[in-house]
From Swiss-Prot:
Odorant receptor. It is found in: Cell membrane. Belongs to the G-protein coupled receptor 1 family. It is a multi-pass membrane protein. Glycans are attached at N5, N199. The gene is OR2B11. CDD domains: 7tmA_OR2B-like. GO terms for molecular function: G protein-coupled receptor activity; olfactory receptor activity. SUPFAM superfamilies: Family A G protein-coupled receptor-like. This is Olfactory receptor 2B11. Residues 1-29, 84-104, 163-199, 264-276 are extracellular. Residues 54-61, 125-143, 224-240, 297-317 are cytoplasmic.
Length: 317
């Protein structure tokens, strides 16, 4: 192995420089404030949903089991990236250790893949609830929900494991500058001085499987849902069904479309400058919006949150 190459098999680079917006110093403070507020809102909102789903008996249905897992994923998702981003924006040393970078993209890909499958499971739940209401309790039983969630976590881990094993073996040469806010596999692969065709191909295949297949299931489920909703004679019933589903579709769009742009375009056309801003959609914007999207139009969740706040108030009083 050449002495100027660094890899998992030899000397690994000590650290990566995360460029972020350091080339635009005027943007760092406003972005720092936005990210900090978004992170606080994401933490508060998702913790509230998890607590309400756990302690309120009215929210022990499959829909809220999936929602509480989605909120937990979003908590972990934002905590994996945002604190590091905030530290770098407030410091002149915008670095992350090689080990820290590896852990970050490993966990990030694990959680991202898991969330793709959880969102598909939520679409399946809504399909059964609206299109097969008489069989809902039999089909969407608690054991099945737990199995789907376990499948999501295990699949996400498998995807992440493959990506990490392939990426840590790449040699890196020269100055290790990542034109991104945090470590992601496409950006790290871009720094390698070796031929990354195998990495690019496997990344595209895995992302296509774990992103496009769940997305196809979601769109198929909502196609059947739309057809069933249009048959509902009650305008109130149609409005309630569309309200629940539209919030889910908005989250799906904000999460999947940027991910597809980032991970499924040819490496030759991949723009790190555009990609680092697009990655903010699924790393912070979607996790921040999720609690509000799922509660503002959901009477059961709003009622549960009010009861939770009342209980906390009594305990504090």
């Amino acid at each position: 192995m050449k002495s100027d190459n660094h890899s998992f098999l030899g000397d690994s680079p000590k650290a990566f420089i995360l460029l972020g917006v350091s080339d635009r110093p005027w943007l760092e403070l406003p972005l720092f404030v936005v990210l900090l507020l978004s992170y606080v809102l994401a933490m508060l909102g998702n913790v509230a949903i998890i607590l309400a789903s756990r302690v309120d008996p009215q929210l022990h249905s499959p829909m809220y089991i999936f929602l509480s897992h989605l909120s937990f994923l979003d908590l972990c998702y934002t905590t994996t990236t945002v604190p590091q981003m905030l530290v770098n924006m407030g410091s002149s040393q915008k670095t992350i250790s090689y080990g820290g970078c590896t852990v970050q993209y490993a966990v990030f890909h694990w959680l991202g893949c898991t969330e793709c499958i959880v969102l598909a499971a939520m679409a399946l739940d809504r399909y059964v609830a609206i299109c097969k209401p008489l069989h809902y309790a039999v089909l969407m039983h608690r054991a099945l929900c737990q199995q789907l969630v376990a499948l999501a976590w295990l699949s996400g881990f498998g995807n992440s494991f493959v990506q990490v094993v392939l990426t840590v073996q790449l040699p890196f040469c020269g100055r290790q500058v990542l034109n991104n806010f945090f470590c992601e596999v496409p950006a790290v692969i871009k720094l390698s001085c070796a031929d990354t065709a195998v990495n690019d191909t496997i990344l595209a295949v895995l992302v296509a499987f774990f992103v496009l297949v769940p997305l196809a299931l979601i769109l198929l489920s909502y196609g059947f849902i739309a057809r069933a909703v249009l048959r509902i004679q009650s305008s109130k019933g149609r409005h309630k069904a569309f309200g629940t589903c539209s919030s889910h579709l908005m989250i799906v769009s904000l999460f999947y479309l940027p991910a597809i742009y980032m991970y499924l375009q040819p490496p030759s056309s991949y723009s790190q400058e555009q990609g680092k801003f697009i990655s903010l959609f699924y790393s912070i914007i979607t996790p921040t919006l999720n609690p509000f999207t799922y509660t503002l139009r959901n009477k059961d969740m709003k009622g549960a949150l009010r009861r939770l706040l009342a209980r906390i108030w009594r305990l504090c009083g």
